[in-house]
Amino acid sequence: MLEFAISAPLDTGAELLSDQVSANFPWLSLSILFPIVGAFLVPFIPDEGEGKQVRWFALGIALVTFLITVAAYLYGYDPSLSGLQLSERVSWLPDLGLTWAVGADGISMPLILLTSFITALAVLAAWPVTFKPKLFFFLILAMDGGQIAVFAVQDMLLFFLAWELELLPVYLLLAIWGGKKRQYAATKFIIYTAGSSLFILLVALAMGFFGGGTPNFEYTNLAQQSFGTGFQLLCYAGLLIAFGVKLPIVPLHTWLPDAHGEATAPVHMLLAGILLKMGGYALMRFNAQLLPEAHAQFAPLLIVLGVVNIIYAALTSFAQRNLKRKIAYSSISHMGFVLIGIGSFSALGTSGAMLQMISHGLIGASLFFLVGATYDRTHTLQLEEMGGVGQKMRIMFALWTVCALASLALPGMSGFVSELMVFVGFATDEAYTLTFRIVIAGLAAIGVILTPIYLLSMLREIFFGKENDQLVSHTNLVDAEPREVYIISCLLVPIIGIGLYPRLMTDSYTASIQELVKRDDLALQRIKKPSALMIRNTTMTPAVVSSPRLPITQTRSEQLTRK
């Protein structure tokens, strides 16, 4: 008994010490810098020119990066806390107010994991690349670090630099390895994304220099600033344009079908799985979190734009005869649910938007990978030129069917849960009038009805449509290879897992989403003249007026120190 009484406190102390070390370890900086450093080592890898050695090296770097992000989640992240965790802060250029500040909360941590996971699979999907393989894998690894940085940095000026970092690799991946119109698609991509990102820089400078003195661009500082309503509205409008291009929001979407139409399978996976999520994440992080009063007034517009995305993109996808462009417009349609969820003032609806980003990242990556695999066999993207290949590619047909069912939100798949959460969250959101909720829900349901029609008809045309004799007779239609089955299986495991037990993912961000919604609810109640047609009038209470800003939640390290 004496031995037990002595050893128990020692074990507890050792456990706390271990937790403290894990929380203070620079997990996020390592996950950002490791793939970037690995990218710069690629030119020194001995290779015979076909990329056989380079691709193994790149796969190893991508897998280690994924394991680093998993370790960060397991050993340094506490899902029950809503505040910033895994914090690292180094004063970089103090005169300019630029700080290397990284951290993660429930809004960013799931997307960091998604980024490293999709990138590792994209490297495996790039196995057949033999044209300039060193440059190709260099760009993929550089994108890995840059995209993780977008979700992890906690300084707005540093965020802008990370946002710009991933533009050049995508441009080169499109311009060098794309299809016949690759130069047009790459140029259009860089004009849209680089041009719109200037708004991020302008808003960052305006918010950082707000109030005079030494500029400070850190999120924690900006969240405590008392920005005027007019200032918030201007900043919100600029950021909505910048992030709306990346999401993308109609009519700022036209670069995406062109980019997808010319990209290769691994680039497809990065575009659909990660790049679009950067726009949704940024809307949550900046527009909803840092500019709550402006968000309360812009929220109805986000919901209307979300419905436009859903219906317009679904109808356009229905009319597309090019397989890549059909799936591209389908992606735009599904991202409309993210806008509706972000515009919702309910925790369920906003949580659904977060889950929809994760779900669509997985489903979109799987569909576009299958598009690339199918093109490698048929050498055509026109649906009327396909048909009758189902008998020779039965495994491929099975993979296509499962992924298409996930995209059309079949119960038991992640897409069903996320869209249902958005629908129910918005329908029960009493911040909006009943008429507005009924109209929006009814219109959004049109997209839900159209999705299975164009996806299932697409499958019928590809595999069981009118046979193309030249394709069936003279083309070596090889069925799915083990590598391809493995990639799709890796994506289907979380898709089905989240669909059957959503708490596998929702528990990781619920606390942060609830804090975000609470902040926006308080901002909504401070608005004096809400729109009578869309937003219900709210009564201002003394408790709300006396608390203009929410307190910063203690970090993981502070909690451990208190223990």
UniProtKB/Swiss-Prot annotation:
Domain of life, per lineage: Bacteria
GO biological process: ATP synthesis coupled electron transport; electron transport coupled proton transport
GO cellular component, one term: plasma membrane-derived thylakoid membrane
Listed EC numbers: 7.1.1.-
Record GO terms (molecular function): NADH dehydrogenase (ubiquinone) activity; ubiquinone binding
Protein name (database record): NAD(P)H-quinone oxidoreductase chain 4
PANTHER family on file: NAD(P)H-QUINONE OXIDOREDUCTASE CHAIN 4, CHLOROPLASTIC, NADH-UBIQUINONE OXIDOREDUCTASE CHAIN 4
Enzyme class: translocase
The keyword Transcription appears for this protein: no
UniProt keyword list: Membrane, NAD, NADP, Plastoquinone, Quinone, Thylakoid, Translocase, Transmembrane, Transmembrane helix
Its job: NDH-1 shuttles electrons from NAD(P)H, via FMN and iron-sulfur (Fe-S) centers, to quinones in the respiratory chain. The immediate electron acceptor for the enzyme in this species is believed to be plastoquinone. Couples the redox reaction to proton translocation (for every two electrons transferred, four hydrogen ions are translocated across the cytoplasmic membrane), and thus conserves the redox energy in a proton gradient.
Originating organism: Prochlorococcus marinus (strain MIT 9313)
Localization terms from the record: Cellular thylakoid membrane
Bilayer-spanning residue ranges: 25-45, 56-76, 90-110, 111-131, 133-153, 157-177, 189-209, 230-250, 264-284, 298-318, 335-355, 356-376, 397-417, 438-458, 485-505
